Amino acid sequence: MSGGAALPVSQMELHKVNEVQFEIFKERQIKSYAVCLVEHAKSYANAADQSGEASMICVWVPLTSNSACETCHRKHPECPGHFGYIELAEPVFNIGVFDLVLLVLKCVCKTCGALLLNTREQDVHKKLQHMTGLNRLRQVAKMAEAKCRVSTSTEDDMGIDGFDSAPFNGGSGMGPGATRGCGASQPRVSRFYGIYPTLVIKAVHEEQDAEWHADKVRQVLDRVSDDDARLMGFDPQRCHPRDLVLTVLPVPPPQVRPAISFGGLRSDDELTHQIMSIVKRNNQLRRDKESDVQAAIDRSRALLQEHVATYFNNASTYYKPTKVNDTKKLKSLTERLKGKYGRLRGNLMGKRVDFSARTVITGDPNIDVDEVGVPFSVAMTLTFPERVNTINKKRLTEFARRTVYPSANYIHHPNGTITKLALLRDRSKVTLNIGDVVERHVINGDVVLFNRQPTLHRMSMMGHRVRVLNYNTFRLNLSCTTPYNADFDGDEMNLHVPQSLLTKAELIEMMMVPKNFVSPNKSAPCMGIVQDSLLGSYRLTDKDTFLDKYFVQSVALWLDLWQLPIPAILKPRPLWTGKQVFSLILPEVNHPATPQDRPPFPHNDSVVMIRRGQLLCGPITKSIVGAAPGSLIHVIFNEHGSDEVARFINGVQRVTTFFLLNFGFSVGVQDTVADSDTLRQMNDVLVKTRRNVEKIGAAANNRTLNRKAGMTLLQSFEADVNSALNKCREEAAKKALSNVRRTNSFKVMIEAGSKGTDLNICQIAVFVGQQNVAGSRIPFGFRRRTLPHFMLDDYGETSRGMANRGYVEGLKPHEFFFHTMAGREGLIDTAVKTSDTGYLQRKLIKALEDVHAAYDGTVRNANDELIQFMYGEDGLDGARIEGGQLFPLPFRDDKEMEDTYKYEYDVDGTFSGKVGGNYMDPHVRKMLRADPQNVRKLQEEYEQLTADREWSRKMLDLEDRDKLKLNLPVNPGRLIQNARSTMGKRSQVSNLSPITIIDHVRKLQEDLMKLFPSYHRGGDGYIRNTLSRERIESALTLFNVHLRQLLASKRVLKEYKLNDRAFEYLLKEIRTKYHQSLTTPGENIGAIAAQSCGEPATQMTLNTFHNAGISSKNVTLGVPRLLELLNVSRNQKHASMTVSLFPPYDEKRNAQKAQHLIEYCTLESITRRIQFIYDPDPRHTVVEADRDILELEWNVMDESDAELRIQEVVAGSPWVVRLELDVDMVTDKALDMKDVKQAILRVDESYIIETGMANNVRQRTIRMRSRYNEGADSIPKLKREIPALLARVHLRGIPGVRRALLKDTTEFTVDQATGKMSGNKIWAIDTDGTALRRAFIGVVGEDGKNIINAVKTSSNKVPEVCSLLGIEAARSKMLTELREAYLAYGLNINYRHYTILVDTICQHGYLMAVSRSGINRSDTSGPLMRCSFEETVKVLMAAASFGECDPVRGVSANLVLGNQARVGTGLFDLVLNMAALQQAVPQAEAVAPGKDVNVYHSLGSTLQQNIQSSIAYRPRDHDATPFVNNASLFLRQGFGGGSSSAPVTASAPYNPSTTYHGGRLEASAVHRSQAYSTSPALEYGGREASASQMYSVMSSASAFNPVSTRMSSVAHSYSEYSEASSYHLQHSVAPTSMQASLPRTDNSMTMQGIGSVSVPYTPHAMSSAAPPSQVYASTEVGRSHSEDSRSQSALYVPTLSPTHAGYAIRGDEPSTHRSDSNVMWREAGGGREQDEEDDLSTNYMPTAKTPQQAAPPTAAEFGDEEEEEQ
C-alpha cells in the first residue's frame, strides 16, 4: 500500500534501486571496506575502555541512543555500521559454496588448473550454449568426468604429491586431441565425510586416500584461467573460483548483531561470541604453526574450520551444532536469513505494521454491507493524519481542543516538532497553522482496510466505511462473511487505517466491498443474502403474506421512501402483499428464474418472475438472491453497477430483519417429531432396503452376483450394499421433506436455502443412515468384525455402520460409535489439509506473481516474456463473465435452421409474396422486393449461420442440448428482453429491414474488434499486423457466432419483434457491456489465477477414494492429485490411460475382447496354486487327478513321440512343479494352453512341460519339471525360481497396464440428409497403469488389425505425454487434468485461471514444476525472487558465486527493496518536466487575495522547496480565452525506452463559478461537490466521454503512482476529504518526482502535454488500443457534475494508438467551440502504412495546435451542457 507524506519522513536522500549485482568479495575488497583488523577478541566491557582504538570500538561496541560512532561520528540510527576483518592463519572452506568447489575441481586439472575439456570441439559449445551459472558448471563437470580417463604409469612418472602424471588423452593433456595442460593423470575427487569438511583425492596406485585441505585447494583454483572460469559459468571480474575459499573473514558491525538489554544489564549477541571464538582459534592456529607441531596444527585447523562453518550455518550435516548453552543452539547467519521468520520473509517480504487493530467480530444486520462497526476505544487510538488548510482549519481545531471523542492525539508541525495533546493541561488554547498535520481520531465515514486471515484471495482484504459503535468488538454485516470465510464463533479480524490520501483513494476506487461483489474466480457473486435475511425474504414473499398499512409505512421509513404502492386488497381494509414490499427494494431489472428441485407450476407460486423491478410471482430463495451465478445480485451488478447492489442488499436486510422482528420465527420440538404416517413410510423404506441387502448377500454366497469390472466378488458385494444403503437414505430424505407440513420451520429454512437440507430432517426425525469411512462401510477392526458385540464375519447392515434411529429418538451405543468414526475422519482431514493447501497456495503465488496484462493486450511476466497472446484466450476480465447462456445452434437440424433463420423464396429465387407477412412492415417488404441484391444478402446470412453451426459442432465440447452453456461477457438474451420491455412498442410487425439488421450486426462486430488494444492499428482502425489481427479475431470468434445466431434478422423481426429504437439500444448496450468486460492493462492476473486455484483447494479432501459402483479404477483426488500435477511428478500413484478403439471394437461385446487383449497378463496372475511334488515316474503319477490328463496328452501324440517324451521326463528332475490355473480367468482371456506352454519356454527352456496342451478339460493344470536332476538342491532352487519365472511369463496385453476397465462415452454424429445431430454410445477402455508408447504401437486383434485408435488415446501422466507428443499436447493434458481435479469436488473455476497457470508451467518448452525444483531452477526469475521463496542462502550463495544480476523487475524483488512493483498502477511512470515549473510561486502567494490563481503541489519533504507548479489565468473580458503557462506533464509507461517528445496544448475553458475582482480571477466559495467540470473529450475509436478531473495535491512524490486504470483521480479523493479551498481552483498540473524509469527499448517514446490535456473516459481506460508509451492525464477542473458522472470522471490514463490519425480534442456536443484544439498524430518519416510482424517498430511524434487556435466558450454553451447533463 502506498504511503503518504502526511507524517514526517526520514531526511536521508533516497534513490530507486534499478538493479542488484551479486558477487563474492575478494580479499582486497574486504580489507578496503573494513575499518580495522580484528586480532584480539574484545568483550563489550574492556573494548569501551580502549583509548586510541576508535575503529576497534565501532566494530565491537553497539551504539546506544546517546552515543556517537567513533568512526563516522554519527548517532544511532544514522550510523550504518562499520566492518572489520580477520586475517585467517590458513584458508578455510566457505561451507555455503563447498559443493561448488567440488564441482570446479572435477572440471580442472589438479596439477596445473587447466580445464579438462577440449574447448575447440563444437559439441562443447553446443551443449553449453543456453546454459548459465550453476547449470553450466554442472554440465561442464559432467562432460569432464565422461572424458577423463586415468592412465597407468611407472613410479618414475609420479607428479606432485605422488600422483600419476602420465598424459591424459582427449583432455587438456599433451596426448592426441589435447590442446593444452600439463598431462598429469587426474585422480577422482570426492567428499570426505569426516569430522570436518575435507576434499579427498583418490590416487591411482595408493592404498590410502590423500587429504587436501583448503590451502592446497586454493592453490589449484588459483591456477584456473579467466577463460576457463567463464566457460564454467563464472564471471572472473566478480567471482573467480579462487574466491570460493576464504582467506579473510569479514566481521559484521554491531548493527547486525546488536546487544540485548534487560533489567539494566547488557548481553552480547550470539554471533559476537562466535566471532570471538573464531579470533581465538585463528590466533591459536598461528601459534601452532610457529611451533611446527603437526598434530597441534591439524587440531587447530579443524577447530577453526568448524567454528567458521557453524558461524555461517549451524544446521549443517558436516558438524555437530554449536551450542550457546546446554540447551540453546547458536543462531547462525543462515538461520537468521532463511525460513518464515528470517530476514527475507519475516522482515522484508512482510512485516508488522502500525495503525492497525484486531479484535473479535460479531454480526450486525443494521449496518451497511460496506460498513464495519468500530469500538470507541479503537477509534480513539487509531488516527488519520489530516493536513490543515483554510477549509478544514476550523474543524481540525475543534478536534484538537476537544478532550472527548471525536478528538485528536498529535499535531505535527512543519519544523518537525510533535505536540502530544494528551499532555497539555489546557487544550482549549491550541491553535493550528496552515501546513500542520493533525492526527485525528477515526470517525464515521472514514475508509479502512478490513482483513481476515488466512488471506486466501483478494476478497479476504476489502475496504469498509467506519461506523463507530459501543462495546468492544468489530461489527460486520452478515453478507460479508462469505468472502472472508468468517463466522461469529470467536473469529478475529484485522483493521488497518490508511495514512495518506493516495492510499485512501486506492481503497475507495479498487478495494471497497461493492467493487468486489463479483469474484473473478467463478465469475459469480461472492456475496449475497444469507441466513436470517434469506429466511425473511422467503417468508416475506410467500403467497400467503399480507401486510397492513402500519407495517408498510414502517418499511418505507427504513427504505427512505415517501410514496407507497397501491394496496393489493382494498376491502375490508387495505393490505399489501409481501411481494409488493420486496419490489420496493428492487431496481428496474428483469429476472426470470426457477428455483431448483421445484416443479414449474405457476399456480403453485414456484416460478420467480421479475419484470421491470416488480416481483410478479414466486418466493425469493437462495438461488435468486444468494451468491450464485445468474442470481439477482449478479444481474443487478451487471446492469446497474456495484452501488445499486449494495443498496439492494442493505434494503433487503433492513426490511427482512424488521419483518422477522414483527412476525417472529422459531423452531420447536414439534418440528422435529414425525407423524405416524411418515414413520410408517420410513419403516417400509428400511424393510425394503434390508431385504435388498439380504438378496445381494445371498447372491454373493451363491457366487451368482454380477462382478463389476476389475473387482473381486467381495468388492462387488460391498459396492452394491453401500449403494443400496445410500439410496435408502436419499429416498427417505425426499419422502420426509414431502410429508412434513408446509409451515414446519425446518422445511421453511430448507426451502429458503438459509440452512439445512432434506437429509438433516431425515436424520433428526427418522434415522441417521449409513456411516462411511473413506468412502466405504465401517471395516472390520476387531477379529473379523467391527465390534466385539457382533458375530464373526457379520456383513449385515447393522454391524457395518447402519444407524436405524434418528437424533430425536437417540442412537444406540454401537450406532453412536460408528457415527463418531465417520465424524472423526472429517476432523482429521481438516487438520491435515490446512498446511498442505497453505503451502500449495504459496507456491502458486510465487510462480505466478509477476504475470500481468500488458498494454498491447498480451500476457507477460516481469521480463516481458510472452505468456499468452490474449488473456484467457479472449482478453476478458473474469469478474465480467456471465455463464449459463444456452447455445442451441449445434443441435438445430436443417428444418429448424430453415424455420428459424431462412426466409421464404419463390422457385425463381426471388422473395415469396408471403415473406414477412405477419412480422414485417409492408414498406420494408416492398423495399426488399425492389432490389434483387437483397436476396443474395439474406442467403449469405443463412450460409454464414450454417457455417457457424458446423464450426460449433467441431470446436465445442458437446454433451446435451440443455447442458451446452456458454460463458460470455455479455448476456444478449437478457439485453433483448430489456430492449423489448423498455424500448419496444407493443406491435405485431417491426419497422426494421433485414438488410439493416445484417449491416448493423456486422458493423457491431467490426466495432468490437476496435475495442481491443493493438500497436498496429491504422488511421482507419484496421489492424495491419497479421498476428495481432488473428489473435483478436480468435478472441471474438465464439462471441460473434453466438451474436449472429441470436441477432439473425429473421429472429429479430419474427421472434423478438424489435423496432428500430429498441434494436439500436440493444446494439449499443452490447458494445458497452463488452467494452466494460475487457481486462485492465496492468492487472496482476497471475496472482488472481493463483488465488483462484489455491483458495478452492481448501475445500478438497486429502483422501484417495475407491470409486464404488460402475468403475473400479483407483484415482487420486483432491490435494494429492493437485500436488502430482503441479510438481510434475513422474511417479504418479494412480497413472492411467483412456484407450480409444477402432470399430467394431468400440461396441460393448467386442470391447470386452479388446479389454483382455490390452490388460497385461502373466502366468502368475492366472495361477491359483503352486505345488512341488516328488513324482519321478509320470507313467505312475502319485497325483491321481493328473492321470487322465497325462494319458490324454500321450494319446494325442504318436507312439514314438510319446516314448521319447517319457524318457525325457524320467531323465529330468524327480520333482514336479504343478500349477493350477484359474479356469474362469483362462476362459475370460481366451488363453490357449499351447500359447501358455510356448510363453514358458520362451522365458526359460530348461523346463519340460508335461501337460498343458489340451483345452477341452475342465481343470487347467500345468505340470513341469527341470531337465536337470540336481538332487537335494532341487526344492530350494525351485521355490526360489518358480515364482520369479511365473511373473516373467508374459501371456498377453501391454506391459504396465495392470487392469483394463470398460468405459462408455458419447460420440456425436450428423445425419447428412436431415442435418440432425445425435449422440451414439461407444465404448473405450480405462486402464490402471500407463504405457502410452506401447499403446501407440498398437495391439493386434483377432482379424490381424490394430484395435487401438492412437489419435484419441491419452494418458493422465503429463510428463509421459510431454515426452511422446511434445509440450503443446502436455499443455492440453495438464489443463484437462487440472479442471477434472477441481470438478470432482464441484468446484467450477473460470477457464482463464487454468490457462494462466498451465501456460506458465509450459512457457519454456518444458514442464516447470511449481516447487523449489522448478521455480528456483528457472532462468526467468531473479535471485531476489528465488531467495524469497525457498533455499534463501543457497540461492544467494549461487548468485554471488556466478555474478548474477537481478534487474529488479519482479514483484518480490521490488518489495524487498521498497520499490513500487511493476504491475497495476506501477506498470507506467510519470515524468515531470522540471524546467516548466521554474515560474511557479509558493503556496502562500498562490492563495493570497488579489493574486493570480496558482496551485501548489506538495511532493514530499525532500522536494517541497524545489518543485512548484502554477497555472495563471489573465482574462481580458468575459469571452476571452484564458492562457496556460508552459507547465508540461510527461507520462510514459515503464515498458519501452527513449524520449521523443513534442508539446501538446489545449485551451482551458472559462468556469462560471469564478468571479473577477480588479481584473484578476479568484475562486469563489464553491462546495466540494461542484469542483468537477466537463472537459474536452478526445474522440477515439468511436468513444468519447468527459474525463477531466481536478488533480490537486500529491503527497509524497517518492510514493506517488498514478491511480489504477479503474480508479478515480487522487484529486477527487483529496478535494472531497481534505476540503482545501486553495485546491478548488480551475486548473492545475500534476507533477511528480518519479523520473527514474526502467530500461526501455528504442522504439517507445515519451509524450509531453502542456497545461490541461483532456482524455476520453472508458470504463477500463487503460484497455484502449494503444502503445504504452503514450499516456495522458487530465488536469482540468470546472463546473459541477452529477453524482454518477463524478464517480466516473477521474485521472484516467488511457493510451492512444500511434497509427490512428486525426484524434480531435473537442467538447461534448453541441459545444463545438473547442473542436479546433486538436491533437494530430503523424508518423515520423511520412504516412506509410506498416505491416510488420514485430511490435513497436516505428517511432511516432505528435503535433499539436497552439492554444490561440481554440475559440473561447460562451456562457450559453455552458448552460446548454448543464441542461444536457441534468
From Swiss-Prot:
Disulfide bonds: none annotated. Keywords: DNA-binding, DNA-directed RNA polymerase, Magnesium, Metal-binding, Nucleotidyltransferase, Nucleus, Transcription, Transferase, Zinc. The keyword Nucleotidyltransferase applies. Its EC number is 2.7.7.6. The keyword Metal-binding applies. It is found in: Nucleus. It comes from the Eukaryota. GO terms for biological process: DNA-templated transcription. Mg(2+) 1 binds at D487, D489, D491. Residues 1742-1756 have a biased composition (Low complexity). It is an enzyme of class 2 (transferase). One of its GO terms (cellular component) is mitochondrion. Residues 1660-1766 are annotated as: Disordered. It catalyses: RNA(n) + a ribonucleoside 5'-triphosphate = RNA(n+1) + diphosphate. Mg(2+) 2 binds at D487, D489. Residues 1706-1716 have a biased composition (Basic and acidic residues). Residues 813-825 are annotated as: Bridging helix. The binding of ribonucleoside triphosphate to the RNA polymerase II transcribing complex probably involves a two-step mechanism. The initial binding seems to occur at the entry (E) site and involves a magnesium ion temporarily coordinated by three conserved aspartate residues of the two largest RNA Pol II subunits. The ribonucleoside triphosphate is transferred by a rotation to the nucleotide addition (A) site for pairing with the template DNA. The catalytic A site involves three conserved aspartate residues of the RNA Pol II largest subunit which permanently coordinate a second magnesium ion. DNA-dependent RNA polymerase catalyzes the transcription of DNA into RNA using the four ribonucleoside triphosphates as substrates. Largest and catalytic component of RNA polymerase II which synthesizes mRNA precursors and many functional non-coding RNAs. Forms the polymerase active center together with the second largest subunit. Pol II is the central component of the basal RNA polymerase II transcription machinery. It is composed of mobile elements that move relative to each other. Belongs to the RNA polymerase beta' chain family. This is DNA-directed RNA polymerase II subunit RPB1-B. It comes from Trypanosoma brucei brucei.
